[in-house]
Amino acid sequence: PSRGLGDVYKRQQEILLTPHFYAHFDKISSFLERREYSFRKLTKALNEHDMGTPLSLRKGAEVYYFPGIGDAKQIRELTIEGTDILLLEMPFAQWTDEIYVDVKKLIEKQKLTILLAHVERYDSFQKSRKIWNQIFKLPLYAQINTGGIDRHKKKRFIKKFLKLQVPLVLGSDCHNMKTRLPNLKQGRDSLRDIFGETLLAAIDKTEERLLK
């Protein structure tokens, strides 16, 4: 890893590794094989560098919604390691009754803990709020990415979303060290400055509870 990546790792205690999974062009078995190969490469590189405090890495996936996911038998294999948490990326379109039923099945039939990825990205697609409101009444969790929290549009969204009283966690949306860098610290600082320490403390407690 680069010096920058090492510096980032030294500031973290645990990192969730959640590569994208798209059921319309991938098989779970193939995805898991590639993920394991990448994970071994990563851990080998970490072992070859002085990364300071030992870091906990958990494998997972960011699973893009597909019709029928609520009944998918192997879906549990994509949960975050050591948990029953499924990080679910929702459609970038108007949400429908079918989507609601699938999410409900994941919770009630599959007995999974659903964490909806980067919820701020779906807001503009919801011309009707009916299904949006129904989904966020389900016992699930929502993730907000830390990038751009100080921008007006995102601040406005967070303020509105907080009224739904859905438990929140934060994500860095880190994809690389050039264009989509780790930004968790900056995002946390912005969140604290704008919304106060109480919200940040509540988020920390939610994250701790989910990953215990």
Regions found by a protein language model. Give the residues of each.
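Single conserved hydrophobic/aromatic residue that forms the stacking wall/gate
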Residues: 1-9
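Short acidic/polar active-site loop segments enriched in Thr and Asp
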Residues: 13-14, 112, 168
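Short beta-strand segments at enzyme active-site cores
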Residues: 13-20, 58-60
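Short acidic/histidine-rich active-site segments
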Residues: 18-20, 166-182
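Active-site metal-binding loops of divalent metal-dependent hydrolases
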Residues: 20-21, 62-63, 119, 147-148, ...
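Extended substrate/RNA-proximal surfaces in nucleic-acid metabolism proteins
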Residues: 26-143
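Histidine/acidic-residue-rich catalytic or RNA/ligand-binding cores of hydrolases
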Residues: 126-133, 152-164, 178-190
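Mid-to-C-terminal alpha-helical segments outside catalytic/metal-binding sites
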Residues: 184, 188-212
